[in-house]
A protein has these predicted regions:
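Conserved catalytic or regulatory cores that recognize and/or transform ribose-phosphate-containing ligands
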Residues: 1-197
Length: 197
């Protein structure tokens, strides 16, 4: 289910999708603590939800990007770079936490050894670049558990920044539907896609 918020601090749960269940522990912790989140992993994903995902990637204060060993992750590894760039472009008060499993699952590796070899090489390359060049608002973590702890620390840091500065991030306080409608060319605007309940 996609969770949306129109104000406050939101954690974007990007990264490995498919049949992956890594988000479950995060969602349970966030709901217990009252932390807002965006979960792009839905059963009935439709192309029009891409705009909602893009909005959250550009606006959520904390972006999580785990690349697990459950897939070869060619697309996810490329999206990792985009996530880091988006955090830099849209403001220094945004944070990205990245976890890249250095290997692929054994069963997956046996199914296509060449793709697994390429994936492991790409994972090492992306990790090396991130560790060497990551800006101060990008955190490379070593496990999903570390990512959850880091995300909660980052939410607390965002809350402190908001209290200290006041909520001057007016752009973030408006809904994805508002921005999709406001940015649509005049005369061609279709209603913004409804978010699943």
């Amino acid at each position: 289910m996609i969770e949306k918020t129109t104000s406050g601090i939101t954690v974007g749960l990007f990264g490995t999708c498919g049949a992956s269940t890594w988000r479950k522990a995060f969602i349970e912790a966030y709901e217990k603590l009252g932390v807002a989140y965006f979960n792009p992993q839905v059963e009935d994903w439709r192309p029009e939800l891409a705009d909602v995902e893009a909005w959250h990637l550009a606006n959520d204060q904390v972006i999580l990007f785990p690349v697990t060993g459950e897939t070869f992750a060619a697309g996810s590894l490329a999206e990792t770079g985009f996530s880091v760039l988006s955090a830099l472009r849209w403001g220094s008060d945004r944070f990205v936490a990245v976890y890249i499993d250095p290997t692929v699952d054994e069963e997956l590796a046996r199914s296509n050894p060449e793709a697994a070899k390429d994936s492991v090489r790409a994972r090492k390359l992306v990790l090396a670049h991130l560790r060497e060049q990551a800006p101060r608002n990008v955190f490379v973590v070593s496990s999903l558990e570390d990512m959850l702890r880091t995300s909660l620390d980052l939410v607390a840091a965002c809350a402190l920044l908001e209290r200290a500065r006041g909520n001057i991030q007016w752009r973030k306080s408006l809904s994805p539907q508002f921005w999709l409608q406001a940015l649509a060319p005049q005369g061609t605007a279709e209603p913004a896609p409804a978010l699943p309940a």
